[in-house]
Design a protein with these regions (language model features):
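Structural preference for beta-strand elements that scaffold enzyme active sites
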Residues: 6-8, 33-37, 59-65, 133-137
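Catalytic domains of cell-wall/extracellular-matrix polysaccharide-remodeling enzymes
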Residues: 110, 118-158
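Active-site gating loops and adjacent loop-to-helix segments of metal-dependent hydrolytic enzymes
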Residues: 73-106
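Boundary/entry segment of secreted carbohydrate-active catalytic domains
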Residues: 2-18, 24
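Active-site beta-loop-alpha junctions enriched in small/polar residues
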Residues: 12-14, 39-41, 65-69, 139-141
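Short, acidic/polar
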Residues: 17-25, 116-123
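A short alpha/beta connector and helix-capping loop motif
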Residues: 18-45
Length: 158
């Protein structure tokens, strides 16, 4: 049985700035993209409207681009102190998350990641078309950290 292969031309970080949103939308309108990874914790104004305008132009698959290293958290900052500073901004790099995942704080990190992950997925899912598969990846590939991947699998199962 022969299966047809499909290549995704993906733009990451939709929502990192208004200008990048505009550029990504332009690429989608010109048929250069068929997948867009959206930062759920974006503070860009009217991100839902910007995404809808892309859907109106062309069929594009959207992806939740989980972010644990940049910007503000989506969940309550008091619930995830290993991830954010007192202002709610993420405070760890990829390496920092890896170090914590191997430390005595591993169990607490697992619970805090789960809290933030659920909040980000819930927020982003509201932007996307209903009854469509939900694709998930992560900013700076943090889902490749074994603990984060494990939490992601757990959240998906739930």
């Amino acid at each position: 049985m022969k299966t047809e292969s499909y290549i995704y031309w993906c733009a990451d970080d939709f929502g990192i700035t208004a200008a990048s949103c505009d550029r990504i939308a332009e690429c989608a309108a010109n048929g250069c993209l068929n997948k867009i990874s959206v930062l759920p914790n974006s503070d860009v104004e009217d991100i839902a409207g910007r995404l809808k305008s892309i859907l109106d132009i062309q069929k594009v698959t959207f992806c939740v681009h989980l972010n644990f290293v940049e910007g503000l958290c989506v969940s309550d900052k008091n619930d995830i102190p290993l991830l954010v500073d007192c202002g709610g901004s993420f405070k760890n790099s990829f390496t920092g998350l890896l170090k914590i995942s191997l430390s005595k704080n591993r169990k607490a990190l697992r619970e805090q990641l789960k809290t933030e992950m659920k909040a980000q997925i819930s927020r982003a899912a509201a932007f996307f078309p209903e009854n469509e598969p939900l694709f998930i990846d992560s900013h700076q590939h943090t889902h490749m950290i074994p603990l984060i991947f494990s939490v992601l699998c757990e959240v998906i199962e739930e």
